[in-house]
């Protein structure tokens, strides 16, 4: 449970969040013969979250809240289910062995919840918090059958429901709630949602080992997802790999403990980020809210999503070659990899020039006439520097380089929307062949003139730099060229120490916060700005167009994890053989 209290008085703003989670996994295996076995696995993951946030009626200067306490109540329940069945065959021969697995998997991801709100309560924040939840239960229990949302104010109440068995023109029903209930607020609304996604897979894998030296692997997957239309729900993804354990050969010296050559090629599918049923236009009631007049809004029907039944799986062909090596019983070991990945049918959220549905200006599409290529190299090294009875010290280092480029498409897609005052329709990136994905495309900022107005590079040659007409690729993108990591591990008697550093280099970040808020224009409307704005020479009424003015280097090195521990020896055969005292510091997020 997390509580957040802030503002000028301890009771002015109140927030409570409570999350519960239950996980369970069960498996059963049956050996049919010495070589054949069957296994069934089930998984259940249930979480429910509840959030209540309140503004006291004593808060001043916030629209419609002053004198009228306002709060929101929300729930989010998610249930993930897994069923998997496999049949395995394992056979050892005189000079080889084979391992075959075939299986079926089904996953269900169900989400449902409530977004509710009320206005018009007194200064007792604890009472108001409980009433926000109670009000929903009071009304929901009086409504017969399912519903999408309901609301009331001092003049009316209504409930909206969808009859899925009725013809379309009579399926959407809006009517009075009809039964008596206690009204705990001046106005109250509740919107509900309920959706389910499914993933079904058939798969097979064959591993064959010859003479403990040569390893062959082949796999095949057929994955079906409800996030795509009926004609494109399934994607088919084969892969194969070969490995040669060279250290098993007679011509390799004893000091070489590991030497393996690896070759692999395979196709991997992706459907992440699509959301629920974005391949088809649907109709539902719009969400209800509260107006500044303390009345609830009307809720008519609206379209959701855009028709795109051609939406399909994104696929990535990964071809790689690598070497694993180790010396002196792997005291020094590592790996080296070269790879090339070609992504086709890239899934992207693009802006529609002529929206199918008013107000819905974006659509998920596949980049069907092009591909995105990633190719690079990876190196990992590990070394045990000291190995004694009282003291050990080891280190691991990895570094990788990646080159990214969009190829073979004639499309030009503007991405990276930037929001804020004066930034309607603004964007910071463009997808175009010959450039990396997420390349920044904008005017190049050169400073301020004598009047404090921003100046830009003149690209079109008309003698004047214009932030809209003189956009260009500025040679920066949002993907790092280099990534690296370093871990240090040591023990001294009962003490242990671990540290992990990581870094990313060769990429840029657009500071949309500075663009929207921290400029001289904020001074004229009584907004806080950073101190550098006061000395920048910028005029208060100048343009805040998207430009390299707000483009920053994203390179960083950070200490991500640091831990120090001490093991306290304990005599006897109790429940614990040792007690670990641990100091642990972790930074999971980027420092910008």
Regions found by a protein language model. Give the residues of each.
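Aromatic-residue-lined binding/catalytic grooves and analogous aromatic/hydrophobic interfacial grooves
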Residues: 475
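Extracytoplasmic gating/loop element in the C-terminal half of outer-membrane beta-barrel translocons
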Residues: 62, 187-194, 225, 451, ...
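Conserved active-site-proximal loop/helix segments of enzymes involved in bacterial cell-wall
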Residues: 348-352, 465-467, 518
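C-terminal beta-signal and terminal closure region of outer-membrane beta-barrel proteins
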Residues: 367-374, 421-453, 520-548, 586, ...
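Glycine-rich, aromatic-lined ligand/substrate-binding cores of catalytic
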Residues: 478-509
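Extracellular/periplasmic, surface-exposed regions of secreted and cell-surface proteins
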Residues: 7-55, 66-430, 493, 551-586, ...
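Acidic carboxylate motifs that coordinate Ca2+ or other divalent cations, activating on Asp/Glu
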Residues: 462
